[in-house]
Structures are given as C-alpha cells and as structure tokens.
Amino acid sequence: MHLQLKSHMTISAPAEKVWCILAHDFSTIGQWASAIPASQAVPDLSAPSGAQVGGRVCTTAVRGFADVQETFTSYDEPSMRFAYQATEGRPWFLKHAENHWAVHSLGPHTSLVEVQAEIDMNLFPGLFLAPLLKLQMGRVGAQTLEELKYYAERDQVHPRKLKAQQKQVQKEAPVRARH
C-alpha cells in the first residue's frame, strides 16, 4: 500500500539560506522543528558530494516512531534538491519511507520549498492505518514547513518549538530529581 503526501511553502528568505538550513545543517533539524526534540549526525555514514553528513538520527515526538535514522538517497547541491529515507527506527508496518525536498529561488529574498513524502506500508494494518497516518503526517509536515519558514525568516525558533522544549525539560526534571 502506497501513500504520497506533497506540500510546499513560500518563504521570505533567500533560497541559499533555506538550503543551508535544510541541507548543510541537515543533522540539526532538532534545533528548530517541534516534532524532533533532538537530532544528531550519524558519523559512520559517508556523505554524498556536497553534503556535510551522510545521515542523521532524529528523536521524534510522533507516536509510533522512536529514534529514526535517516540516510541521504540523493543530494544535488547545484539544483538544491535532496532525498533521504528512514533506514532504521520505522514502525514495523512501514516498509519504506522516503522524503524528497527541493528549494527554488523566487527572487533575491524569496524561496519556495517543496516536499514530497513516499510511504509504503504492509497491507495489514496499513489499510486501516493509512487514513490516520496520512492525517498525522500531513499535520506534522505542515507544522514543520511553518516552523522552517519562521526560523528562516526570523532567525529564531517557532513558539511551538519553544513550548515543546519546555515540555521536554519538565518531563526530564522528575527523572533527574530521582537520581
């Protein structure tokens, strides 16, 4: 069973700046995206030509996903396009999950970001979960683009990310107090 989700966002920032956030700083998505409490580079993956890293591990705030390793499948610096797939940490019912990103210049201070997610699921329980997964992934994708826009345009994280960070600190505080 195959799902495809597409989205786009116009951002009032130069394409080069947005590309830097998405591609050059690929491993630091956890600094600005609320669905990703933390992220880091995978040091033992070789980086494609032009990329800083070969992949990242993201701790997610999305139910059903634990730490997900994402590995570049393509990277094209001149055309500002890349794709990556979740290679580890996917829920058992997902056979394949891949995202394609492209950044286009619409002028010196405006860019367009396009995202396409491709997901292949097992027929069971995919048939039943597909509508919920599509809804959840669509919502998370829209929020991530909104947070990217905010981050690129204002050089600061979205209030939703700040709130998520505060929740994470509060969640960890009782654990630290017990030790």
Model region roles, listed by residue range:
Residues 12-16, 76, 106-108:
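Short loop segments at secondary-structure junctions
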Residues 1-48, 174-179:
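Hydrophobic ligand-binding cavity/cleft-lining segments
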Residues 1-3, 64, 95, 109:
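Residue-level preference for beta-strand/loop junctions
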Residues 7-9, 68-74, 97-105:
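Hydrophobic/aromatic beta-strand elements that line small-molecule binding cavities or substrate pockets
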Residues 86-143, 150, 159:
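Beta-strand/loop substructures that line and gate deep hydrophobic ligand-binding cavities in soluble
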Residues 30, 40-92, 112, 143-166, ...:
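Glycine-rich portal/gate segments that line the openings of hydrophobic small-molecule binding cavities
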Residues 35-43, 59, 96, 103-104:
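Hydrophobic, well-ordered secondary-structure segments
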